[in-house]
């Protein structure tokens, strides 16, 4: 952990990219009730619409500064004993009634369990088990929905680009990824750059263990007997050496479900492999909090760059809530958000200098 002097130096440098308009936007995300857009933020902050909308223009010149801020935070909270976990996952921002945006497409929405219209993005984040720090994101558009001259990229391609861009900039022990990344192409990429991983794999994938070629769900070596909850085996997927873990867990409606994890992390028991994979859940919680508390789905602008700015501001607000949670010993991000909102509302008439002790980026 850094010393107090390092904190002060870092904080002084981080102030450079936060303009007054960006500051208004972040504060508004915390105190707005209901939809969080430029109109409501300007109303609750008591400033003009233009002064809030200008934050989108300010962001264009400060995108790299924001990513550097996130990367510096990772270096502050990572230690040799716990270098952290790299996470990549996709989420959909619902836009059911929107019509004019090059980013609009139909995609499966995991929370609604159906295909909906919206904006899909792939997000990279880092966690050490105590704090979650978003790092970068990029948009995905379904091939048939592309209306401009952009080249189609699969979500796994975007994920590889994010990992490649960030792998040498931040410390992490391994990457924990969902079942969408349990394929030959992605595993080859991870092995190529000597990255450790823990990935859930669909049960219909064929693997080879002890010379037996069979699907994961039917392989005799991975069969769990009676009350057995974990089983580990060394095998191959498409010729790629992997450690394969079968894990029986509780499913919906009090049922039992067997999931499969592949990894190349040596020296762990089957249970420890399951715990290593579980480190990817913080990114799911981040998506939920960003949508429910910070209005991730509330941007009503049409241009792509405005959506990018809004998402970035939401991720910045989430990060500040995470930092406040650590600093004040809060038990959850939601409690941290309520604490910050109360502090802002109590100081609304005191001037902007009073926000300096509340946010790391101000």
Regions found by a protein language model. Name each.
Residues 57-131:
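Active-site-proximal, Lys/Arg-enriched surface segment
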Residues 43-55:
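Short, basic interhelical loop/turn and adjoining N-cap
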Residues 39:
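Residues within the helices of the helix-turn-helix
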Residues 1-10, 14-18, 22-27, 32, ...:
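Single, function-defining residue in the core of a domain
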């Amino acid at each position: 952990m850094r010393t107090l002097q390092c904190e002060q130096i870092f904080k002084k440098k981080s102030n450079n990219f936060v303009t007054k308009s960006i500051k208004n936007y972040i504060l508004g995300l915390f105190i707005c009730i209901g939809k969080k857009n430029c109109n409501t933020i300007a109303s609750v902050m008591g400033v003009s619409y233009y002064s809030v909308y200008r934050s989108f223009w300010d962001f264009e010149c400060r995108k790299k500064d924001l990513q550097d801020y996130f990367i510096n935070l990772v270096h502050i909270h990572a230690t040799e004993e716990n270098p952290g976990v790299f996470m990549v996952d996709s989420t959909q921002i619902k836009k059911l009634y929107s019509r004019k945006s090059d980013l609009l497409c139909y995609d499966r929405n995991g929370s609604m369990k159906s295909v909906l219209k919206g904006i899909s993005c792939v997000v990279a984040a880092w966690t050490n088990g105590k704090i979650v720090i978003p790092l970068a994101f990029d948009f995905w558009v379904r091939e048939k929905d592309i209306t401009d001259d952009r080249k189609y990229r699969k979500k796994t391609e975007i994920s590889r680009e994010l990992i490649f861009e960030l792998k040498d900039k931040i410390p992490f022990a391994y990457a924990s990824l969902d079942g969408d990344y349990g394929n030959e192409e992605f595993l080859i990429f991870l092995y190529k750059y000597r990255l450790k991983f823990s990935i859930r794999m669909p049960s219909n994938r064929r693997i080879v263990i002890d010379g037996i070629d069979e699907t994961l769900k039917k392989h005799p070596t991975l069969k769990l007997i009676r009350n057995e909850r974990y089983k580990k085996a060394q095998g191959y997927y498409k010729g790629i050496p992997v450690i394969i873990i079968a894990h029986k867990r509780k499913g919906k409606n009090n049922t039992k479900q067997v999931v499969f994890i592949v990894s190349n992390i040596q020296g762990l028991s089957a249970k420890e492999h399951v715990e290593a994979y579980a480190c990817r859940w913080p990114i799911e919680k981040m998506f939920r909090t960003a949508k429910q508390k910070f209005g991730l789905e509330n941007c009503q602008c049409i241009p792509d760059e405005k959506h990018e700015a809004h998402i970035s501001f939401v991720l910045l607000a989430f990060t500040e809530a995470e930092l406040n949670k650590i600093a004040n010993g809060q038990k959850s991000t939601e409690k941290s958000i309520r604490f910050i909102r109360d502090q802002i509302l109590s100081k609304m008439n005191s001037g902007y200098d009073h926000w300096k002790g509340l946010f790391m980026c101000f």
